[in-house]
């Protein structure tokens, strides 16, 4: 190539190299390396794809609605479909759980892990807000890991409690309240009973005059439900006062408050909300947290 | 162009006539000519070796005894196992795969430090399959000249027949490539039987379809464009190379000035310098990516060395020494031009470092692989609640413990806890017998159990006592242990 011929060509980078675009900044020239044409066509294809997408799927917001797309797809129906797929997938394992008696599930390692896995998820969804993520409980909400049960810790008792609840309005649910003694007993009497109750679990000395007075008041007013020796009664959901485990707190002020105003925590009935299989799984899960009897 | 020529000359400072060059360029058809030579033979050997391994490996059997697949290489997704001859990788041992990837990267770096992009030229799947597809193309449509002539000419029945035949063979190869891929994920003979009787899974058919399409497109149609536009390796390689790396290089000091054999002979007689390059363009014609190696190192060059073979053949014919194009380092080229002794430095900081790292990681992996046990235990302490006070005043901690049995037979393990004298251990769902808590696990399986540890005595406030969970095989006595803590209020 002669120089005169080259003069009306774009400048070239070195011998035989690609031409430059002619743009120059501080002596740096931009090479003109054309993109491959298929690249351009790929770009056009994505644009066409975008138009197709607008038509096929929900895409554009309108004043009070949105374009729904000719495919009729929406995320809500997609979720419904996925859940039904999941249920189909789980049908076999759910059937296994449903057909085996509650007492036999824990004897079978496969069923046990199945029930615990399902129970864990159901617990997190439904029970954790009150009982805590690991069933550790909170003030007024029993710790499900220990061996202290208000209404009983056998599989059947746990299943009954979950299904029908406590003071839930369900006819078969557990009833029974801790009465408010504020209008029945004097403040001094309540204080004495509180001292006695604390002595039952060894939290306070039992040989003080106050505790001795409290023992008499206890026998007259509290023993009906809590038993003469304060061991409680699971039929009534009355608490065992001799162990060191407290639902609302074991300090004197809290006990005085409990005696004065009474207690009556509510657990909802889960029978109407959860499937029998799920309740079964939940029962096994709670039972195997460690306190199961 | 003509109108531009009539305009007055522009100053060199503003030379812009950029619109003459297109922004987008259609692909320039490349018709690489066949070539014979040492490097071509090497490529043939590697092609047969690598493709042979790829296509046939799934059919190699490896007896692992009962309860285990007998396929030598198997990626078993349903049971989450990876089998490689005598090695069985569990999901939690995925670090071996990570290690292999790191090794692969380092080996690539080492290859690059020693001899440039040899990976690209000889072993890269894109190169190997493109080479195979080119061979089919040459076999059906003829070598460079014949093929070019046919493509430029009118559509005849013969041309159509050849094109149809070529694409059919390509699709067949592509289909078999996809087919071989899925065989790595299931028992190969069974899957083949299922596939031909249309009993195979949708995933298998879809995978084959996708891989057929990509193989056909990438090796048949995209070819060098994958290397030039899509592959990141040329860019990375450019950042990793140095002046001692061997690259396919045109020795311009020997080749220039170019000229015909006659002109060169005349020039030499007259005592003038004459290059060995006779401008025969053979190096360009044989190049599968269509570059001219005489322009120096460039991005599109995959360094397959076919131009070396082509040039050597010409040099032999014109009785000039071979190696006008050769694997040559920048440093050696410069040394030769400066009249200094040749430079060959394969042992240098980066190659030593790469080799040391490869050896270190490789030996480390080997060491852990050899020292692997057939049983394992892992524990997670309950976080919420961390501990529980029982009605009798004792303290209890709960753990989720997973036991691993890598042997291909049922095993029974005795579980015990050390570090907390007097503590009682119980496993949910397991009856306590005379041997204590004995947990059975099926072959090649894991089992998760909930373990409760109860302590009667008093603990210091805020106690966190180190404990060790231990399992012991009831038959062989093999043990495994894991450390955790017993926590008090």
From Swiss-Prot, chain A:
Q: What does this protein do?
A: C-type cytochrome. Part of the cbb3-type cytochrome c oxidase complex. FixP subunit is required for transferring electrons from donor cytochrome c via its heme groups to FixO subunit. From there, electrons are shuttled to the catalytic binuclear center of FixN subunit where oxygen reduction takes place. The complex also functions as a proton pump.
The name this protein carries in UniProt is Cbb3-type cytochrome c oxidase subunit FixP
Question: What Gene3D superfamilies does the record point to?
Answer: 6.10.280.130, Cytochrome c-like domain
Under the heading InterPro entries, the entry gives: CcoP_N (IPR032858), CcoP_N_sf (IPR038414), Cyt_c-like_dom (IPR009056), Cyt_c-like_dom_sf (IPR036909), Cyt_C_IC (IPR008168), Cyt_c_oxidase_cbb3_su3 (IPR004678), Cytochrome_c_Oxidase_Subunit (IPR050597)
Which domain of life does the protein's organism represent?
Bacteria
Q: Where is this region: Disordered?
A: 1-25
Question: Which gene holds the coding sequence for this protein?
Answer: fixP
- Name the Gene Ontology molecular function terms of this record: electron transfer activity; heme binding; iron ion binding; oxidoreductase activity
Q: Which residues bind heme c 1?
A: 127, 130-131, 267
* Annotated GO CC locations: plasma membrane
The biased composition feature labelled Basic and acidic residues covers 1-11
What's the chief localization of this chain? membrane
Q: Which residues cross the membrane?
A: 43-63
The coenzyme or cofactor needed here is:
heme c
Q: Where in the cell is it found?
A: Cell inner membrane
Q: How does it sit in the membrane?
A: Single-pass membrane protein
Asked if Kinase is a keyword of the record, the answer is no
Give the similarity note: Belongs to the CcoP / FixP family.
């Amino acid at each position: 190539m002669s120089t005169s011929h080259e003069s009306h060509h774009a400048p070239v980078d070195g011998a035989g190299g690609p031409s430059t675009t002619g743009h120059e900044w501080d002596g740096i020239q931009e090479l003109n390396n054309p993109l491959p044409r298929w690249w351009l066509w790929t770009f056009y294809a994505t644009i066409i794809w975008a138009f197709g997408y607008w038509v096929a799927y929900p895409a554009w917001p309108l004043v009070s609605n949105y374009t729904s797309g000719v495919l009729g797809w929406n995320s809500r129906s997609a979720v419904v479909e996925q859940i039904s797929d999941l249920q189909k997938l789980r049908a076999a394992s759910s059937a296994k759980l449903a057909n085996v008696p509650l007492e036999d599930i824990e004897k079978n390692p496969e069923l046990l892990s199945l029930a615990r896995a399902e129970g864990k998820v159901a617990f997190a969804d439904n029970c954790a807000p009150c009982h805590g993520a690991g069933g550790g409980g909170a003030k007024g909400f029993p710790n499900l890991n220990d061996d202290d049960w208000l209404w009983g810790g056998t599989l059947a008792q746990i299943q009954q409690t979950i299904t029908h609840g406590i003071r839930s309005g369900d006819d078969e649910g557990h009833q029974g309240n801790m009465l408010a003694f504020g209008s029945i007993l004097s403040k001094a009497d309540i204080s004495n009973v509180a001292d006695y109750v604390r002595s039952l679990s060894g939290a306070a000395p039992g040989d003080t005059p106050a505790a001795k007075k409290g023992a008499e008041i206890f026998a007259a007013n509290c023993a009906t439900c809590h038993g003469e020796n304060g061991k409680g009664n699971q039929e009534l959901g009355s608490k065992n006062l001799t162990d060191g485990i407290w639902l609302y707190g074991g300090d004197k002020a809290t006990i005085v408050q409990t005696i004065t105003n009474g207690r009556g925590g509510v657990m909802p009935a889960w029978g109407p909300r959860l499937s029998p299989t799920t309740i079964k799984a939940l029962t096994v899960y709670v039972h195997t947290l460690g306190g199961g009897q | 162009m003509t109108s531009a020529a009539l305009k007055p000359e522009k100053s060199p400072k503003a030379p812009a006539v950029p619109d003459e060059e297109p922004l987008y360029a259609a692909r320039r058809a490349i018709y690489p000519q066949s070539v014979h030579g040492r490097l071509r033979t090497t490529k043939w050997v590697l092609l047969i070796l690598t493709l042979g391994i790829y296509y046939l490996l799934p059919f190699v059997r490896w007896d692992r005894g009962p309860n285990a697949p007998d396929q030598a290489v198997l990626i078993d997704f349903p049971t989450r196992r990876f089998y490689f001859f005598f090695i069985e990788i569990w999901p939690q041992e995925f670090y071996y795969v990570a290690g292999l990837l790191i090794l692969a990267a380092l080996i690539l770096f080492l290859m690059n430090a020693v001899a440039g992009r040899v990976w690209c030229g000889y072993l890269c799947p894109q190169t190997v399959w493109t080479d195979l597809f080119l061979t089919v193309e040459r076999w059906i449509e003829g070598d460079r000249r014949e093929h070019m002539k046919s493509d430029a000419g009118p559509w005849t029945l013969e041309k159509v027949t050849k094109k149809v035949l070529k694409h059919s063979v390509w699709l067949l190869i592509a289909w078999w490539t996809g087919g071989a891929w899925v065989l790595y994920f299931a028992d190969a003979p069974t899957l083949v039987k299922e596939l031909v009787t249309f009993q195979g899974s949708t995933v298998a058919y879809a995978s084959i379809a996708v891989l057929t399409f990509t193989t056909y497109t990438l090796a048949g149609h995209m070819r060098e464009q994958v290397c030039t536009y899509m592959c990141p390796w040329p860019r990375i390689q450019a950042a990793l190379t140095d002046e001692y790396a061997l690259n396919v290089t045109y020795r311009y000091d020997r080749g220039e000035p170019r000229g015909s054999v006659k002109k060169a002979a005349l020039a030499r007689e007259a005592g003038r310098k004459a290059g060995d390059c006779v401008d025969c363009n053979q190096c360009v014609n044989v190049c599968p990516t269509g570059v001219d190696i005489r322009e120096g190192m460039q991005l599109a060059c995959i360094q397959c060395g076919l131009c070396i073979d082509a040039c050597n053949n010409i040099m032999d014919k014109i009785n000039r020494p071979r190696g006008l194009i050769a694997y040559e380092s920048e440093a050696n080229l410069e040394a030769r031009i400066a009249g200094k002794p040749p430079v060959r430095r394969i042992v240098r900081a980066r190659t030593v470092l790469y080799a040391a790292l490869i050896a270190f990681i490789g030996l480390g992996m080997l060491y852990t692989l050899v020292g692997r046990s057939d049983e394992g235990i892992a524990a997670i302490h309950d976080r919420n609640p961390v501990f529980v006070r029982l009605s009798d005043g004792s303290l209890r901690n709960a753990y989720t413990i997973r036991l691993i049995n890598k042997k291909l037979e049922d095993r029974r393990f005795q579980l015990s806890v050390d570090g907390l004298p007097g503590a009682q251990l119980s496993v949910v769902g397991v009856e306590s017998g005379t041997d204590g808590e004995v947990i059975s696990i099926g072959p090649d399986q894991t089992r998760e159990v909930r373990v409760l540890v109860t302590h009667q005595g008093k603990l210091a406030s805020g106690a966190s006592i180190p404990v060790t969970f231990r399992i012991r095989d009831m038959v062989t006595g093999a043990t495994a242990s894991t450390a955790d803590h017993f926590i008090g209020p």
